[in-house]
């Protein structure tokens, strides 16, 4: 079972053939398409005509100010968001650094939530546009750290809320403070330890209650270390990258995360080996996801909190990252969602409040319109839509 999947850097030479890999040993990191690819994963290629390249139009120069925005919304049953928009409250600052002659792309998150037909809002999210100071990384190796996450709770609000409040705090405590031999390996190990520790903390608290809490939650987290994204995922929430292809002059939706459900072969094998079973596509006929935070009663049946971790090098052609829970993807394909957002970003009729940059108003509107449209299309789940703007 691969724990890590890499997105290759844009100009990395092609990987060896499958036969050669088989001879040389197992592949540790699964590659995703390079810059020029239009492959959108399982959804197939996504091509958008007549759209400007990333960084064109009103995207402008993004910056990362020292302030940070944390949005934690209670969420407990893998559903989505309230009716108010939640937005990153500071300007994005583009950090120019004489580091490998590169520019650190600014990142800024925007989010909207709708409760939908659910009685309770069980989704949660966190936006931390810049936590470099809190992480205190070795300045010779790392210039900027950002964190964005969505959590889709089930069985209650407590697991998703706990993860939103504690996972990034555990990550900050475990983040490398001194010089390291390999930033990539150290960050991946940090993420694995963080997920394990957060799950253990919640299960300890849940089991001490009378009756014991049975809540669980998915988790999709994007950790940006300079221009490298590390995507850690449990369950069926997703992260999608919108990347512009210069050759085709079209945009593509690239999947950054892997969904975990009990019908997948390796997931089912792990569950069965642990003594569990899969009925009607669910663990023991009940739980829809095969990896999660919480769900203590299913952990002995093969459900795990070990995330898949993928690595992606940002490029000048990247426009934004979409993070959303399955309430969105029940009624939108990744391609449709990205296309919808792009159309909103090109809408010059969107009005802005005095003092707010037009680009912020457009991203806020894109989140809110997409969440509203998901509800209109009949998503009965909570809906959380987070879009992370990539500044150039």
UniProtKB/Swiss-Prot annotation:
The organism's place on the tree of life at top rank? Eukaryota
Query: Which InterPro entries does the protein's record reference?
Result: PP2C, PP2C_BS, PPM-type-like_dom_sf, PPM-type_phosphatase-like_dom
For the keyword Magnesium, the answer is: yes
Q: Which PROSITE patterns match?
A: PPM_1, PPM_2
CDD domains in the record: PP2Cc
Basic and acidic residues bias: where? 72-91
Task: Please list the cofactors this protein needs.
Answer: Mg(2+); Mn(2+)
Please state where this protein is localized.
Cytoplasm
Extract the Gene3D superfamilies matched here.
PPM-type phosphatase domain
Q: Where is this region: Disordered?
A: 1-91
- Principal location class: cytoplasm
Q: Which residues carry this modification: N-acetylmethionine?
A: 1
Q: Where is the composition biased (Polar residues)?
A: 59-70
Its cellular-component GO annotations read: cytoplasm
**Binding residue positions for Mn(2+) 2:** 152, 326, 381
Low complexity composition-biased segments: 31-40
Record EC number: 3.1.3.16
Q: How does it assemble?
A: Interacts with ILK.
The record's similarity note reads: Belongs to the PP2C family.
Q: What is this protein called?
A: Integrin-linked kinase-associated serine/threonine phosphatase 2C
Supply the source organism for this entry: Rattus norvegicus
Mind giving the lineage of the organism this protein is from? Eukaryota, Metazoa, Chordata, Craniata, Vertebrata
Gene that specifies this protein: Ilkap
